[in-house]
């Protein structure tokens, strides 16, 4: 399997091909290549020692919020992929789910118009609403910090 868009098997159908090959007892190997989420993680300025890659979230808000809620209390830096058509909705749902955490949006990494925006989710959402998103996006969101708690969490336990 050869790809022109990063490491095969990361958020693409390559995963299915690899699993089927393994099930059929076919030897599988790979030559490591670039993976956009690793580059976005490093460039985000957020902690890199422990992270969770979540890939593409569900397309609709209700499913996306449930998907994000699974990691609401996670201390790990969270990484998502998103399309330009759903970026604004994603950021609205992320702000609602995670609160106004530090985050970064990476776009068109390794290309001529590569960009990384950093700031609170609210500021990133405001910036996205002022421009027309293009290309694929990687969103990196800080995990829950020390002293933070989930809404309704009992701090006396």
Predicted regions and their residues:
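Class I SAM-dependent methyltransferase SAM-binding "motif I" and its flanking Rossmann-like core
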Residues: 16-74
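Acidic beta-strand-to-loop metal/phosphate-binding motif
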Residues: 1-6, 10, 78-82
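Short, small-residue-enriched loops and turns at beta-alpha junctions
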Residues: 7-10, 59-60, 113
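General beta-strand structural signal in soluble alpha/beta enzymes
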Residues: 3, 30-33, 80, 105
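Charged helix-capping and loop-helix junction motifs
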Residues: 13-18, 68, 118-123
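A contiguous loop/helix-start segment that scaffolds small-molecule binding in enzyme catalytic cores
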Residues: 76-157
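Cofactor-binding loop segments of dinucleotide-utilizing enzymes, especially the Rossmann-like FAD-
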Residues: 4, 33, 56, 108, ...
């Amino acid at each position: 399997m050869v790809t022109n868009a990063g490491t095969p098997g990361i958020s693409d159908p390559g995963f299915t091909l690899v699993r089927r090959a393994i099930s059929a007892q076919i030897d599988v190997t790979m030559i490591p290549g670039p993976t956009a989420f690793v580059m976005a993680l490093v460039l985000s300025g957020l902690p890199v020692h422990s992270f969770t890659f979540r890939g593409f979230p569900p397309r609709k808000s209700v499913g996306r919020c449930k998907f994000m809620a699974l990691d609401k209390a996670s201390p790990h830096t969270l990484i998502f992929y998103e399309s330009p058509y759903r970026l604004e909705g994603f950021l609205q749902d992320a702000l609602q789910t995670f609160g106004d955490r530090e985050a970064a949006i990476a776009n068109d990494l390794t290309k001529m118009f590569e960009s990384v925006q950093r700031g609170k989710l609210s500021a990133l959402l405001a910036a996205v609403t002022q421009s027309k998103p293009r290309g694929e996006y990687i969103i990196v969101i800080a995990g829950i910090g020390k002293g933070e708690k989930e809404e309704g969490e009992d701090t006396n336990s």
